[in-house]
Amino acid sequence: MKNLFRISLLALAIIFTSCSDDDDNQTLPVETNTIVDIVAGNPDFSTLGSALAITNLTSVLASEGPFTVFAPTNDAFADFLTANGFATLEDVPVDALASTLLNHVVGGAVNAADLSTGYINTSATFNGEADAPLSMYVNTSEGVMLNGISSVTTADVSADNGVIHIVDAVITLPSVVTFAAADAATFSELVGALTRADQPDYVSVLTTANGTAPAPFTVFAPTNQAFADLYAELGVAGIDDVDGAILTATLNTHVVAGANVRAEDLVTGTVATLGDAVEIDATMATITDPNGRTSQVIVTNVQAANGVIHAIDTVLLPQL
């Protein structure tokens, strides 16, 4: 009987030892807190989660990154669908939806305090060209405003692979007009000229989607200071004092239609615009108008979905 008891204890010890070894060798699942995990765990991101799944971008935002994601809420997506005439998310063309989502993603983990007013690159691209990332205009004068249409409502939601900033509107793919309107500190005078009542409907033309003529556009955009210098040169008080026909011819001279010409693709020579031709010196980054007046390119490659903007320091005039 004693021997039987000892054998039973020995067997029990072996079983416990075996179980203990199994527990020691068992690999426990590692909990993650990626951007995708946060989206999945927040009911106010359910539409965003569905959009990522539809476009096969879920795996991208679950990868190592790091990424900064400006994440629209369900209400933001609802407003986007209504504004664009879509009944459901599934009605949005997949390629367009994917580009729109990528327009909310920036490489690197950037906290709100590290954002400053100016242009940054998103993960969306012009016409699928990797070397032509779409720009985003960030305005930090009052909170964080993106492209003039979307505000950060909750910042710095930390993830294992980056950071999320919650926004109140979908950041739609920008046109060249988007940046002119959003960057008022630089381009408000240009916007005033483009929208003057006696001028052609430049806004409608310059919001033409890429793939539809006359898009894409290359716009040489004079800054506010450039316009101030022009008013002094012409001896007028402001844009309202410029003759209508001259203003139209002047604005046309700043737009190249049918081409998205980034700074690295500019070549020296004569370039046709919607108005008079201009002379470009690619080496010096200058543009000379028909009157021999020279303008310096001071900001390059503000990339929209339907063209590119290069800011210049002098207004180009047509042949006077």
Write out the residue ranges for each language-model feature.
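Mature, structured domains of secreted/extracytosolic soluble proteins
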Residues: 3-7, 19-320
